[in-house]
Amino acid sequence: MEGLLTGKERSILAKVNIGGSSLSLLGSTFIVGCYFFFKDLRKFSYKLVFFLALSDIFCSFFSVVGDPSRAFFCYTQGYSTHFFCVASFLWTTVIAFTLHRTVVRHKTDVEDLEAMFHLYVWGTALVFTVIRSFGNEHSHFGSSCLTQKGRTSTAIHFFTFYAPLWGVILYNGFTYFQVIRMLSNAARMAAGISDREYQVDARTDTKALNRWGYYPLILIAAWAFGTINRVHDFLYPTHKIFWLSFLDVGTAALMGFFNSIAYGLNSTVRRALHERYLTFWNDGLSMWLPKSRKYRAQAQPSEMVSLRVQDQH
């Protein structure tokens, strides 16, 4: 269906945006909570994931919160969303750069570059947000502020968001390709070693390779329909395709949720959650069970640990 969106269609898009952004907000908040709750996660690598999740929190928050009926709040919502969404995908380049510098170039100075990372992410996001404000007006539907339609406005939006976005996608793809290629070669070399410890490490690296291969696809999944929709808006500024707008809004709103699963919910986080769950469960049993059962409940985990140790050696 082509043409201007009806009030009902705009209401549907607003609800889709709220639903997807809420999932992203919950997922990103969970990752931030894990960073503060588990001291073992407060390493530099996960610190970068923390800032990624923090950007996603504010991107999702400003996507659904505001007062579009007032011009000031409408501008605040629109530009804040733009700023933090740009910062979000820029943090993925920092993570890719850090991994490449550590694995491929064998550098250990990445923590010394933290100040430069912040200057790069927040400074670049601010520059693109300021550029977008030139000659740009805002309108709204539902609870969201949208850029005023027109070729000039669409071109500005594309230049300040989608152009750097696809530059990030290309950079991440190339960077992870180099990292994966190098670790694949190392895994093939380890496969010829009879030592079981090296074979376990090789299988671990293979799991990491499979996971890293999906990282560049997250941004593609989140923004491919948005890119197509912006191109369509530029070519046909007075026409809208509802199903394309639906996919655009829905996938973009889920970016933070995708990031929280791929970057945040890694094996280290899952292991920390599992250990916390076992501790909580065992403490609960010790409070309610009699002494005889309490002894058996404490003895069984130790046997499981010994079995795991035997399996690993």
Say what each PLM segment does:
Residues 1-17, 71-80, 143-161, 200-207, ...:
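Juxtamembrane membrane-interface segments at transmembrane-helix boundaries in membrane proteins
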Residues 10-14, 55-109:
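Extracellular TM2-ECL1-early TM3 structural module of rhodopsin-like
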Residues 11-39, 53, 90, 97:
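First transmembrane helix
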Residues 39-42, 66-75, 133-156, 228-247:
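Membrane-lumen (extracellular) interface motif
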Residues 105-129:
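The cytoplasmic-loop to transmembrane-helix boundary for the fourth helix
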Residues 128-185, 210:
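Extracellular-loop-to-transmembrane junctions of the mid-late helices
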Residues 182-228:
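Intracellular effector-coupling site of seven-transmembrane GPCRs
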Residues 210-222, 226-230, 240-300:
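Seventh transmembrane helix
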